[in-house]
Curated annotation (Swiss-Prot):
Name the UniProt record assigns to this protein: Tryptophan synthase beta chain
Domain of life per record: Bacteria
Sites of N6-(pyridoxal phosphate)lysine modification: K112
Subunit field text: Tetramer of two alpha and two beta chains.
Record organism: Mycobacterium tuberculosis (strain ATCC 25618 / H37Rv)
Gene: trpB
Amino acid sequence: MTDLSTPDLPRMSAAIAEPTSHDPDSGGHFGGPSGWGGRYVPEALMAVIEEVTAAYQKERVSQDFLDDLDRLQANYAGRPSPLYEATRLSQHAGSARIFLKREDLNHTGSHKINNVLGQALLARRMGKTRVIAETGAGQHGVATATACALLGLDCVIYMGGIDTARQALNVARMRLLGAEVVAVQTGSKTLKDAINEAFRDWVANADNTYYCFGTAAGPHPFPTMVRDFQRIIGMEARVQIQGQAGRLPDAVVACVGGGSNAIGIFHAFLDDPGVRLVGFEAAGDGVETGRHAATFTAGSPGAFHGSFSYLLQDEDGQTIESHSISAGLDYPGVGPEHAWLKEAGRVDYRPITDSEAMDAFGLLCRMEGIIPAIESAHAVAGALKLGVELGRGAVIVVNLSGRGDKDVETAAKWFGLLGND
């Protein structure tokens, strides 16, 4: 029986004010000084990164900063996000009980606003007047443009040329919010190339510019800082699921690209050995085809975009182009804390193909009246398979990381819904 009462839920400030037992060392390494993470950046960026690190360590314990963050998260972004039991969807999951953590209902339509409000406030308190960001699906770009409009900061968003075409709606949203959107036409013209250009901008304009990194990757302190701003997802879900199901879940699942939404919901359950944590990465056309973004399934350790983690690379250490129908998962790397959790055996990472994700996308639309982001549909697809594996009555929490407004055209083409009248 679902408990309809509203439990007292934690605030964002509780997620960032105190260090955790899973924090990296002072050099940003998870799992020891020679472990995952670190800072693999040009010397020109070291002083800038140290400035960000010092500012974050100061502000994370500043009551003024924490109060501003809590106020904006509650009154502007709309936290807490609800936890919803998807009873009709559950009928397709071996009668497991599927609960959706509705990050799609946040302002701007995804979990990205959690991180961006924190970093934009930090940028302003550092005296920066200009914020840059990378984006794949456009959700981080929209959230960054939103926060910059709110706080009066100039905003430049770097986005791969392929992604600007397949996410044209989000490009328009960013421009409406006052951001400059730069379409990157080099390399694979996707997220990794957008990050490359953003780093170049940061090196050239560090005095007045803050780089608002969108995922739990990159050089220290970004993997930890982004995780801290996203931890609220799991902290809320942990309280909510015990109120509704009367116990902790059997499994918590999320899609994994760079990994911010996944680490955000996983973190609150890391010390619960009875809770399985499963991340679903983009297998594209199938791992065997080579057209995928399944970094853990087919990748290997290496340095990429400022940290040591897993990435898709050839035998010479050159990055291999990734592929996914989902722009937000079309990335050949992953955050270093995820690499540590994989090696420690705490989180299981599995591939989901484009076809499996789109089947789950359509099913969630029809069964629950919820149009998810295609990124999130990978997690839904994985949860459906895991439900059959775990059996009747198993409780599974899915991080529904974003809504699918941006993906309607892609979905309509996939399902053949754009025929002439």
